[in-house]
Regions:
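Short, intrinsically disordered or compositionally biased N-terminal tails of bacterial proteins
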Residues: 1-12
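Helix-turn-helix DNA-binding elements, focusing on the entry/boundary residues of the two helices
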Residues: 56
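A conserved regulatory-domain signal marking ACT and ACT-like small-molecule sensing domains
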Residues: 14-46, 76-178
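Residues in the recognition helix of alpha-helical DNA-binding motifs
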Residues: 73
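Short alpha-helical "recognition helix" segments of helix-turn-helix
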Residues: 59-60
Length: 178
């Protein structure tokens, strides 16, 4: 199931989710962790990743919390229809950036000046497509959940000269890391 939302709806939705747990900083940390990692919740209130259940103790340990906080957060998610629908359908996607070099791919990390600005992905992809470079994966960190949002692009081939300079010259770009 795919849900297409306007940018303003997405920002509002994320804000609403975080706001829903504003009365509990510990549960808010759990929700943020679930969203950052693409983890969901099963019908019976267990944390899952693509249908594979994960022990609440493992999640709690990862965020420096307690299993009971994780369980209470999952229960609270299931009690609210909008949250229930989101977390029952959440899916994680593999990020191959850490193994890209072993696979012979090139990784470009773009740090934006302002991650909320539109057109960052399009501008970078345009530069790459102008050089007929094949993109294997694009991974964008959501600025609503990350203190250091970034655009990670994985290419099949090595970079020809001049490409990095063109990406660095884009007005949205603060830094490029290879």
């Amino acid at each position: 199931m795919y849900i297409y939302l306007r940018r303003s709806q997405c920002l509002s939705m994320w804000s609403d989710i975080i706001h829903e747990f504003g009365d509990s900083p510990s549960q808010s940390r759990v929700v943020r962790f679930l969203l950052e990692n693409g983890f969901g919740v099963t019908d019976d209130g267990r944390i899952s990743c693509n249908g594979i259940e994960m022990p609440a103790t493992a999640v709690a340990k990862a965020i420096g919390s307690d299993r009971r906080v994780v369980d209470a957060t999952a229960k609270r998610i299931l009690e609210r229809p909008m949250l229930r629908d989101i977390f029952l359908n959440m899916r994680a996607t593999p990020d191959i950036s850490r193994v890209a070099e072993s696979l012979g791919f090139t990784v470009i990390t773009v740090l934006p000046k302002n991650a909320n600005e539109r057109g960052i992905v399009g501008a970078a992809v345009r530069v790459l497509s102008d050089h007929q470079l094949a993109i294997r994966q694009i991974f964008v960190t959501d600025p609503q959940f990350s203190e250091d949002p970034k655009l990670v692009i994985i290419l099949e081939d090595p970079l020809p000269s001049g490409v990095i300079e063109k990406i660095r010259a884009l007005p949205q770009v603060r830094q490029v890391i290879i």
